[in-house]
Amino acid sequence: MMNRLLVFLMLGAAFMLVVSAIDQDANDVNMVKRFVSASCLCASDGPTTRGNSLSGTIWLFGCPSGWGDCKGRAIAGTCCKRE
């Protein structure tokens, strides 16, 4: 009986953790959650990374306002550059 109670309490705590992590305003995505903090190679940088700077930044859910898609290479997300 005690084991069932502990399992129930742990599942309840995990559920509350997930529910409390959801944003109240789903349309307002926080910049920290969108930004990966990794550089990427924009199309204007050239074909290879050798001798070229990585001028793009990877954003997970599209480019925010003030940034444009630089048609670069990113494994996940979008390669964006400040406009």
From Swiss-Prot:
> Pro-region residues?
22-32
List locations, semicolon-separated: Secreted; Nematocyst
All disulfide bonds of the chain are 40-79, 42-70, 63-80
Question: What keywords is this UniProt entry annotated with?
Answer: Cleavage on pair of basic residues, Disulfide bond, Ion channel impairing toxin, Nematocyst, Neurotoxin, Secreted, Signal, Toxin, Voltage-gated sodium channel impairing toxin
The UniProt entry lists the main location of this chain as secreted
Query: What's a GO cellular component annotated to this UniProt protein?
Result: extracellular region
Q: Known InterPro entries for this protein?
A: Myo_ane_neurotoxin_sf
Quote the Gene3D superfamilies the UniProt record gives: Anthopleurin-A
Q: Which Gene Ontology molecular function entries are recorded, alphabetically?
A: sodium channel regulator activity; toxin activity
Q: Does the keyword Secreted apply?
A: yes
Signal peptide as annotated in the record: 1-21
- Lineage top rank: taxon: Eukaryota
Family per record: Belongs to the sea anemone sodium channel inhibitory toxin family. Type I subfamily.
Function text: Binds specifically to voltage-gated sodium channels (Nav), thereby delaying their inactivation during signal transduction. Thus it strongly stimulates mammalian cardiac muscle contraction.
Q: What is this protein called?
A: U-actitoxin-Avd1g
Mind giving the lineage of the organism this protein is from? Answer: Eukaryota, Metazoa, Cnidaria, Anthozoa, Hexacorallia
